[in-house]
Amino acid sequence: MIDIGLSKMALIGAVALIVIGPEKLPRVARTVGTLLGKAQRYVADVKAEVNRSMELDELRKMKDTVENAARDVEQTIHTSASDFQKDMEHSLGDASATGSTYGVDQGLSTVVPAYKHPAKNWRLKRGAMPQWYKARAGVRTRVQSGAARVARFRPQKFH
């Protein structure tokens, strides 16, 4: 930026004091300070905008390279698929020409059955647990009411 030393600033201050006068100098100094602050903020905003545009350009270039790579992969997949399809048609044509019926009579259907989520039976899963594990884990296998438990464990009366 501008190289202003202490001696130059003192000279500028003395000239301003003589030209402007002591009563208007504080107001002029405040105005100059606010204008310098605005100029610094404007320069900082311009620098930020330039940096942002440079980053956007880099991102655009990166996006273009990724899109080109994706197109190349897609093209490779399409060529491989078409080569595979041509080979299959060629081999099926050879098989039908030689009299082989494998694959021709079967129809090579491409019908794939729909996926059905297996229903979980939690009772079966619970029953598949070993008995010794149930006893250790405190799993109740025979649930009784409170009165039935008392009657079961009540000592017998002797007559």
Curated annotation (Swiss-Prot):
Membrane-spanning parts: 1-21
Subcellular location: Cell inner membrane
InterPro entries given in the database record: TatA/B/E, TatB
Domain of life: Bacteria
Subunit description: The Tat system comprises two distinct complexes: a TatABC complex, containing multiple copies of TatA, TatB and TatC subunits, and a separate TatA complex, containing only TatA subunits. Substrates initially bind to the TatABC complex, which probably triggers association of the separate TatA complex to form the active translocon.
Keyword check for Membrane: yes
This protein's UniProt keywords: Cell inner membrane, Cell membrane, Membrane, Protein transport, Translocation, Transmembrane, Transmembrane helix, Transport
Protein known as: Sec-independent protein translocase protein TatB
GO biological process: protein transport by the Tat complex
GO CC, one annotated term: TAT protein transport complex
Gene: tatB
Organism for this UniProt entry: Acidovorax sp. (strain JS42)
Family: Belongs to the TatB family.
Gene Ontology MF term list: protein transmembrane transporter activity
Membrane topology: Single-pass membrane protein
Chief place of localization: membrane
Function description: Part of the twin-arginine translocation (Tat) system that transports large folded proteins containing a characteristic twin-arginine motif in their signal peptide across membranes. Together with TatC, TatB is part of a receptor directly interacting with Tat signal peptides. TatB may form an oligomeric binding site that transiently accommodates folded Tat precursor proteins before their translocation.
